[in-house]
Amino acid sequence: MSELSYRGLFDLSGRTAVVTGGAGILGRHFCAGLAESGAAVAVVDLQEAAANELARDLGKRYGVRAIGIGCDVSAPDSVKAMVGRVVHELGEIHILHNNAAGKSDDLDAFLASFEDYSHEQWRKIMAVNLDGMFLVAQAVGKQMVAQGKGGSIIQTASVYGVMAPDHRIYEGSFYQGRKINTPAVYTASKAAVIGLTKHLATYWADKGIRVNTLTPGGIEDGQNDEFQRRYAARVPLNRMGARHEIVGALLYLASDASSYVTGQNIIVDGGLNAW
């Protein structure tokens, strides 16, 4: 028998991970999972104070190096500066979790009907959800190529990037007290992320850089009981997901456990898309 440690394949000690959207609802769980697995973590978020606070907590809790960085992923100069700071403070980058996604401060505009959706709002969301993915992958990928040691890039999509939302479940549905839907810009941007992942997986394969998509299904987070009931009725496991349930797939994709996996979309949705 080989002396290979299968548990050891998931060990991220000695590696540095960059997580965009790192202080967000799912992002903070992703950062915690990477840190607990031994990685140094750069918590990158538009909300710099939240990123710094989480980085301090990760360092204390897991004994790893962690830094918080404020960054607008839709701004090329901000992304370039972010990568430079990570390399300066933490060294080589081994893992990128391209996770930032945009919603609008103007929820009326973000949740408007398709017929009334403004082009300005469409572009604003695309600037983060797709342009931001491109800019961060480009900058970190360039750094990984220069390092010459490969790497792993994971890009967050959504189950609505592989299937359309069931608009019927939004009847009488609310999120934190307001009526909700899933706008077309979200669906379109997340589908594009999956396409970008496949392209980069083949483009950087000869550099040893693996690129995969992580696709969560619906996560329980402040939706009203009616929405949760209707959503769960469409899921074989009969419930929405919990935030921590997405982390295992990330750790698999970030680690040597997935060393022969690239260009794939790992869907964690309770079986929703299996019907």
Language model regions located:
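Short, small/polar-rich loop/turn modules that mediate ligand/substrate recognition or access, typified
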Residues: L96, A205, R210, V261-G263
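Active-site Tyr-X3-Lys motif and surrounding loop/helix of classical short-chain dehydrogenase/reductase
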Residues: A81-H88, L107-A127, R230
